[in-house]
Amino acid sequence: MNSSVNLNPPSRCIIGIDPSINSTGICVNINNEDIFDYYIITSKLTKKQSQFTHPQIRLIKYEKNETKDCEYSEKERIKTLNFHNIVSEIEKIIDKYHPNTVLIEGVSYGSVGSAALVDLAGLNYMIRQALLKKDIPFEIVSPTSNKKAFCGNGQATKDVMIDTWKRWDSNINNVNEIKIDDLADAFALSVYREN
């Protein structure tokens, strides 16, 4: 029996996902209670991150294959494999919680270079495809809409998002050892319909 499968799924579960190649943030909102589960899927863990422990936050390292010095075709194949590895970790979380819906932050078309934009879009669509295959309803929320619903300002900075999140969930107030802005965005997505 697979121990990661939740045999008694919650009556209402919303998952927020802030996709990223290097640090995907995920927040699991179970029955809109005061306790949330958080995941960061990252390509590398520092020694400090490896020793990080928190009852609600889990760091997951995915296998990232390097594309340095590869020819174009091989580089694109490897990037697709990396996206697949991220999505595989997301699917494990989906299988554990059986969410009613998933909210995904859409690609911010104005904030990254064209190569990074293509990669983020590729990852975003692979996540959507995985959810379609599992018949999980999902919604794409623009970064501006997410910030506006959460902070009242569509141009809110990362620090404002984090400060607003810490007011909602005091259990993460003392988390300073890891980068958490992706979790703040994921949290905002998980409560998006509550705002």
Which residues make up each language-model segment?
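Phosphate- and other anionic-substrate recognition elements at nucleic-acid/protein interfaces
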Residues: M1-N195
